[in-house]
Amino acid sequence: MKKQLFCTIFFVLLISVCFGQKPYKVVFYNLENFFDTINDPEVKDDEFTPEGPKKWNTAKYNKKLGNIERVLFGMAAIDKEYPIVIGVSEVENRNVLEDIVATPKLAPGNYRISHFDSPEARGVDVAFLYRPDVFKLEGQYPVKTVIPSLPDFKTRDILTMWGTIEDEPFFFMVAHWPSRLGGKDVSEFKRIAVGRQMRSIADSVLQANPATKIVMMGDFNDDPTDKSITEGLGAKLKMKDLSAGDLYAPYADMLKAGYGTLAYGDAWNIFDNIVISENLAKGSTGKLKIQKAPGSKFYGNIFKQHYMIQKEGQYKG
């Protein structure tokens, strides 16, 4: 009998994917410039220091830390189970990650950290937090992001980690794709290039073991219907179109229905994405597969609490 996996998209820059009879959650959470307060001379983090323009001090740091703890614990409280894998972006260093997993409400999750410093100018990285009691880590590696036409371009790495869940092989990637600086069309070639690179990694993994289930996540700075995902990653947008070895972008239908993870003007976008392999989408190998969220026609749902609403500033509402 196939076990089920359901995905919940939280529209607070995270996605939850659940496996097993009591679902496991896999989350992506954009931490939005989570810097420590210490000036690192090796990176451009002056803005987020007590002397910088944001006056980033210990009180502000601890407030953000508490908010992140509250969000992640609120997610765990849905079914009284901590997420098994949490991918994050825009975090400065391992010390910040250690502070997150040590918060009183998250410490019982006994999280381990997968993190490497990347060459990004401001020093922000991607990382994974994972529960070793469920995800059995076998390896991890930061892959340098390559833009062929810009050999000196430095950005966040593609962090990969692999292991097993219930004895089934899993391969995770988390990435923060190049921004839309200069405009979507002008910058699109960079995101397409990273999409192709991640597709190449996925193809190599599946060639070595077609039973491996792949989960890609991150801030892609593009919607699931954009070229970087449909052409760069080559992801399909409909479950019925999937064949062995394909990739599936499950949140295109939610975007078309008017949902999103961020709003610009009068339109919603889903820049925070997951893309998964066909065998995880359809359960064509093993016992783990996705399922629709309870009471939803989508592979997702909305997690929104009053304390997540920004009440002032440019992004209030």
Predicted regions and their residues:
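Metal-dependent phosphoester-hydrolase catalytic domains
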Residues: 204-214, 222-317
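Bacterial Sec-dependent N-terminal signal peptides
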Residues: 1-23
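N-terminal, active-site-proximal structural segment of metallo-dependent hydrolase catalytic domains
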Residues: 19-104, 108-110, 114-126, 301, ...
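Catalytic metal-binding/acid-base residues of hydrolase active sites
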Residues: 32, 92, 178, 220-223, ...
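Structural recognition of the beta-strand scaffold that forms the well-ordered cores
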Residues: 25-28, 84-89, 112-115, 126-130, ...
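Structured beta-strand-rich core segments of catalytic domains in phosphoester-bond hydrolases
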Residues: 91-171, 175-177
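Extracytoplasmic, non-cytosolic globular domains
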Residues: 115, 159-254
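Second-shell loop/turn segments in exported
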Residues: 50-59, 82-88, 115-116, 147-149, ...
